[in-house]
Amino acid sequence: MRIEPIIQGVVARSAHPFGCEAAIKKQIAFVKKAPQISQGPKRVLILGASSGFGLAARIALTFGGAQADTIGVSFERGPSEKGTGSAGWYNNVFFKREAEKEGRIAINIVGDAFASETRTQVIEAIETYFEGEVDLVIYSLATGMRPIPNQPGEFWRSVIKPFGQTVTGASLDLEHDRWIDTTLESATEEEALHTIKVMGGEDWESWIDTLINAESIAQGCQTIAFSYVGPEITHPIYLDGTLGRAKIDLHQTSHSLNLKLANFDGAAYATVCKALVTKASVFIPALSPYLLALYRVMKDEKCHEGCIEQMQRLFATKLYGQDHISVDGERLVRMDDWELAPHIQNKVNQILEEMDANNFQVIGDYQGFKNEFLQLNGFGFDEVDYSQDIDLQTILKLTP
């Protein structure tokens, strides 16, 4: 069978196994040539390891100088007679293959990170492969819902809405290359609460508590989770909306976890990353035009970073091998420093003032935006022959 990209709106319905392999190899090649991570962690647990920042962190820590062994948790779908499976499934497969070639331990646990059974599996894997302790825990779950404990079949569901106001902005339909004006109504208090439950810090803290209780935290263990703040132009839909409330909760959680890990001479940080095309970010209405302008400007200025560049720089220049960890006044590690530089934002704002449905593909980096989205799912790589038929039985044997 031939695997073609299938996009519905902003959702990819297909993934190319060997395109995903190409993506993994490309990221590995980058981190091997980049400034290396020194004094890095050796035993790392990544919650949400199969795409985006979680996957990039895993690649950076394994191949970018630290030579870390990793346990990755993700909720992915394998190939079947009905479909190709998810990109994350193949990312897990090919990451493990490449890591093991270099003698690294790479354990994939495919399961619901919210489920108690998954936690039990993780603790057992730490005992078996890591001599019972971890040096770094990365929390990078991106999901729209979370099961309510002790209420089978009931979920908290996050929403992406402004708070206290109606916001009008544009979304991009990647399927038809269209600009769609959208209006978002204000969230209710209940919607905001649900979003905090799904995307805030409660589950992160619960995981760390589980690891502490299992005596799985090594001396000096750190934990990080990823956040976004953005410039003022994005605040109505992001920082001042339901997502922002959840991220503020995440930031506050980092402080309480920092106190808990102080008992192990460790620390906890929320890491503010730059705006990027990820499976999650393309869902945020009104953020896409900003991304088009930002990509254009940062590429022109030769300071554009994707997930892998961000993660390698984070571990090589901010979190490890430094006399002290540089944080802002709120104890946040800022990886959005290049994005928020005044000269970058001034140029972004100039483009946004002119951008509309007629010219967004010309004055913004729409081609780069869409290609990055396709590459998340294994498409758009020059080195892959997409005309080649793929035998279903071959990919059914690819297990993480």
Swiss-Prot record:
Has the keyword Ribosomal protein been applied to this entry? no
Tell me the keywords, alphabetical order: Fatty acid biosynthesis, Fatty acid metabolism, Lipid biosynthesis, Lipid metabolism, NAD, Oxidoreductase
Q: Catalytic center at which residues?
A: 238
Residues annotated to bind substrate: 228
EC number(s) of the enzyme?
A: 1.3.1.9
Which InterPro entries does the protein's record reference? Eno_Rdtase_FAD-bd_dom, Enoyl-CoA_Rdtase_cat_dom, FabV-like_NADH_b, NAD(P)-bd_dom_sf, Trans-2-enoyl-CoA_reductase
Summarize where NAD(+) binds, as residue positions. Answer: 48-53, 75-76, 112-113, 141-142, 247, 276-278
Q: Which GO terms describe its molecular function?
A: enoyl-[acyl-carrier-protein] reductase (NADH) activity; NAD binding; trans-2-enoyl-CoA reductase (NADH) activity
- The organism's place on the tree of life at top rank: Bacteria
Q: Does the keyword Oxidoreductase apply?
A: yes
User: Mind listing the GO biological process terms from this record?
Assistant: fatty acid biosynthetic process
Q: Where is this site: Plays an important role in discriminating NADH against NADPH?
A: 76
Pathway entry: Lipid metabolism; fatty acid biosynthesis
| Catalysis performed (reactions) | a 2,3-saturated acyl-[ACP] + NAD(+) = a (2E)-enoyl-[ACP] + NADH + H(+)
Q: State the family named in the UniProt similarity comment for this chain.
A: Belongs to the TER reductase family.
- Quaternary form? Monomer.
- PANTHER family cross-referenced by the UniProt entry: ENOYL-[ACYL-CARRIER-PROTEIN] REDUCTASE [NADH]
Name listed for the protein in its UniProt record? Enoyl-[acyl-carrier-protein] reductase [NADH] 2
| Species of origin | Vibrio vulnificus (strain YJ016)
What lineage does UniProt assign to this protein's organism? Answer: Bacteria, Pseudomonadati, Pseudomonadota, Gammaproteobacteria, Vibrionales
